[in-house]
Swiss-Prot record:
NCBIfam families: hslU, PRK05201.1. One of its GO terms (cellular component) is HslUV protease complex. ATP binds at I24, G66, V67, G68, K69, T70, E71, D282, E347, R419. The gene is hslU. This is ATP-dependent protease ATPase subunit HslU. It is found in: Cytoplasm. GO terms for molecular function: ATP binding; ATP hydrolysis activity; peptidase activity; proteasome-activating activity. Keywords: ATP-binding, Chaperone, Cytoplasm, Nucleotide-binding.
Amino acid sequence: MTNLTLRNQLTPKQIVEKLDQYIIGQNGAKKSVAVALRNRYRRQLMDESIRDEIIPKNILMIGPTGVGKTEIARRIAKIVRAPFSKVEATKFTEVGYVGRDVESMVRDLVEVSVRLVKEEKMQLVRVKAEKNAEKRLIKLLAPSQKKKQTTSQNPLEALFGGMNQPDESPEEEVDQELKNKRSQIEWRLQNGELDDEIVTVEVKEQQNPMLDMMRGAGMDQMNGMQDALSGMFPAKKKKRKVTVREAKKILFEDEASKLIDADELAAEGIHRAEQMGMIFIDEIDKIASKEGGGNAQVSREGVQRDILPIVEGSQISTKYGTVNTEYILFIAAGAFHMSKPSDLIPELQGRFPIRIELDKLTQEDFYKILTEPDNALIKQYKALLKTEGIDLIFTKEAVERIAEIAFQVNQDSDNIGARRLHTILEKLLEDLLFEAPEINMESIKVTENYVNEKLAPIMQNKDLTQFIL
């Protein structure tokens, strides 16, 4: 990375400004994450002798649910297009117990990283891949007479997916009539006239969904064996009838994959995961050990000890190659209602030197969440009803009342942070969303009286409040 590329990267202040577009408050957390991110760019500029000595300062976020812990990490990864993986600590168990192996978090990160790199490389070969895909599609829509004659297939070839549709060889003669037909199809294809026509294409068979279900039951170790076996035989394919519009996408992806070097893709994916990857470990407080926990405490402490070497830096085998986790940034988060950070084993505590306590949301925060972010909830509901031709208008007093109710319900019952706004707005607009297709009005105004009318009966009944809001 050169000085020029570093100057082109976002500064910590710019990162915080971008986060402000989506997340209200929590400036301390935003600052810490922005600095951690900038330090990764700075590290790339250093001499190799000192670069290897500088490891990311992992972050521990402490705060109740719904205050923005996950959203900060998720948004930061999107802003910088860094590989990002979110896991829940409660999904893991120590090796030998039923559950997911902790190493799977690294494998998930590498999958995301390789996918990001592949998307970028596909854009680089897009023009050529689209041209090749179009040629194949034209041949499918106007096959030669020789192609139409079906040949008996070897049983073993059929078993292992040898169903490829061979294109005409360069030496094969194509008569003038077929050339004219294909030329006409090409013109119509480029003008979108054939987008809704049906064509038969061959696609790779998807992995059996049962295998995905088994992964959750501690079967991550099967991945390597499955990948090794799949490499021994050609990918099994099946014929599918799709529209020309869908066929364009299928054939483009297939042609783009042929133009991308698989080894280079894997190497770059691993490098990016190692140098720029971020793993968000949620609910880490749930595996904090407490005295007198019995077998449950042993299991929780076991998970911590399994996570420790990954956070410290270790070599993890994936289907793309070995990954060094030493320079991956780990962000852990938890509410710590029933435990405290000091309940984590000392070695793990030491691996999260940056501690950030996120603030509880105030009534003013709720108001800002409803109105200020680019993806604010009120803007979302307005857009939903706009599709029905209705202009939804909220008065300032109505929004203030919604914020007040959300804050009050959080105070009186379980505090679920900003997520409370989802339940309140859904209840408030339930009838309107249901009746919208039959309403012959160009605009509807939501006033403070409307909010009180819809929510007051529920607010007055504590039992109903707990169940509905």
